């Protein structure tokens, strides 16, 4: 997405571009997109048509780097998908131990108020 497109972004357009970048799983592309979308109306915790947030999709894909990036930009690890599963449930079920450990650490850190 070009700077010109980002400067005139609308919420639906921005969400669509964001969801597409998550599906691609390219961490560098998504980081650039998130940094450039700071002036847009944008919600990193929005639900896509499949009832998943970007964080849920990244966990399903087993992409720890993308999970970390999304959390850095405000993804809520406590949100449940349409089936009632949190990112931690999905990671455990999928056997993504690295993501499980990361999410537990983040949850403990958030619970301690730090």
Swiss-Prot record:
Induction: By Notch signaling via a CBF1/Su(H)/Lag-1 (CSL)-dependent pathway.
Free-text function comment from the UniProt entry: Downstream effector of Notch signaling. Involved in the regulation of liver cancer cells self-renewal. Involved in the regulation of canonical Wnt signaling by stabilizing LEF1. Involved in angiogenesis acting downstream of Notch at branch points to regulate vascular density. Proposed to integrate endothelial Notch and Wnt signaling to control stalk cell proliferation and to stablilize new endothelial connections during angiogenesis. During somitogenesis involved in maintenance of proper somite segmentation and proper numbers of somites and vertebrae.
Record note on quaternary structure: Interacts with LEF1.
Annotated ANK repeat ranges: 50-79, 83-112
Organism lineage: Eukaryota, Metazoa, Chordata, Craniata, Vertebrata
Claim: Zinc is one of the keywords in the record: no
Source organism: Mus musculus
Phenotype upon loss of function: Axial skeletal defects in newborn mice such as rib fusions, fused vertebral bodies and fused pedicles of the vertebrae; defects are influenced by the strain-specific genetic background. Embryos exhibit expansion and fusion of myotomes, dorsal root ganglia fusions and defects in projection of the spinal nerves. Embryos show increased level of Notch 1 intracellular domain (NICD) expression in presomitic mesoderm and somites. In contrast, fewer somites and vertebrae found in -/- are linked to a longer segmentation clock period.
Keyword terms, alphabetized: ANK repeat, Developmental protein, Repeat
UniProt entry tagged with the keyword Membrane: no
Similarity annotation: Belongs to the NRARP family.
Signal peptide location: none
Stated name of the protein: Notch-regulated ankyrin repeat-containing protein
Protein's GO biological process: blood vessel endothelial cell proliferation involved in sprouting angiogenesis; branching involved in blood vessel morphogenesis; endothelial cell proliferation; negative regulation of Notch signaling pathway; negative regulation of T cell differentiation; negative regulation of transcription by RNA polymerase II; Notch signaling pathway; positive regulation of canonical Wnt signaling pathway
Tissue-specificity statement: Expressed at high levels in the brain, heart, colon, kidney, liver, lung and small intestine. Expressed in retina, most prominent in endothelial cells at the migrating point of the vasculature behind leading tip cells. Expressed in testis.
């Amino acid at each position: 997405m070009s700077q010109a497109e980002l400067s005139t972004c609308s919420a639906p357009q921005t969400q669509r571009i964001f969801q597409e970048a998550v599906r691609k799983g390219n961490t560098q592309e998504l980081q650039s997109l998130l940094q450039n979308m700071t002036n847009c109306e944008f919600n990193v915790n929005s639900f896509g048509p499949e009832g998943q947030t970007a964080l849920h999709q990244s966990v399903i894909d087993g992409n720890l780097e993308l999970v970390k990036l999304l959390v850095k930009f405000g993804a809520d690890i406590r949100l449940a998908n349409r089936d009632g599963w949190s990112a931690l449930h999905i990671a455990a079920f999928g056997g993504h131990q690295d993501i499980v450990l990361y999410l537990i650490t983040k949850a403990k850190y958030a619970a301690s108020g730090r």
